[in-house]
């Protein structure tokens, strides 16, 4: 198995505690409202904490696809969230899983800085397809910004 690591940083004007709550604890409700392609997020097993497996159903290229999202760790005090995409028909055949390590920090002017480490665990000695990696980064950035926009548009969100 090969492991290929990529890092991505982003910023937000939303404070870390509020953004973490939206991205981690309320995302199952927010995401289908703010991302047209994502139709449902359902818990298949667990209670939302580590070990929970979620099914994200989305439409891409006119096809209904899904991925299985496994929660690995949540640390509310440190604003850390680790999860993996562990299966589904929306994941490349050469990928065993994709692991994400996300952390929010205090940013300038009361906002946040987000750091994401993404690890592609490939089958055998296969390398991730660069186009798929770039598309994944773009989708992740768009998802983050959509949740941020929801929080900003709903000032009473807590």
From Swiss-Prot:
Q: Could you provide one GO biological process annotation from this protein's UniProt record?
A: defense response
* One matching Pfam family: Bet_v_1
Report the domain of life of the source organism: Eukaryota
Coiled-coil parts of chain = none
Q: Which GO terms describe its cellular component?
A: cytoplasm; nucleus
CDD domains noted in UniProt: Bet_v1-like
Q: Which key words tag this protein in UniProt?
A: Pathogenesis-related protein, Plant defense
Q: Which GO terms describe its molecular function?
A: abscisic acid binding; protein phosphatase inhibitor activity; signaling receptor activity
InterPro entries (UniProt xref): Bet_v_I/MLP (IPR000916), Bet_v_I_allergen (IPR024949), Plant_def-hormone_signal (IPR050279), START-like_dom_sf (IPR023393)
UniProt entry tagged with the keyword Iron:
no
Q: Per the similarity annotation, which family is this?
A: Belongs to the BetVI family.
Identify this protein by name.
ABA-responsive protein ABR18
State the organism of origin. Pisum sativum (Garden pea)
């Amino acid at each position: 198995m090969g492991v290929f690591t990529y890092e991505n940083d982003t910023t937000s004007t939303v404070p870390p505690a509020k953004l973490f709550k939206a991205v981690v604890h309320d995302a199952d409700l927010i995401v289908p409202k703010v991302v047209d392609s994502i139709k449902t997020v359902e818990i298949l097993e667990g209670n939302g904490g580590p070990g929970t497996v979620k099914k994200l159903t989305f439409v891409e290229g006119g096809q209904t696809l899904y991925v299985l999202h496994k929660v690995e760790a949540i640390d509310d005090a440190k604003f850390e969230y680790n999860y993996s995409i562990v299966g589904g028909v929306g994941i490349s055949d050469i990928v065993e899983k994709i692991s994400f390590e996300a952390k929010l920090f205090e940013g300038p002017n009361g906002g946040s800085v987000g750091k994401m480490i993404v690890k592609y665990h490939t089958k055998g000695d296969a390398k991730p397809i660069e186009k798929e990696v770039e598309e994944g980064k773009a989708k992740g950035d768009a998802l983050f910004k959509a949740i941020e926009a929801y929080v900003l548009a709903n000032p009473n969100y807590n």
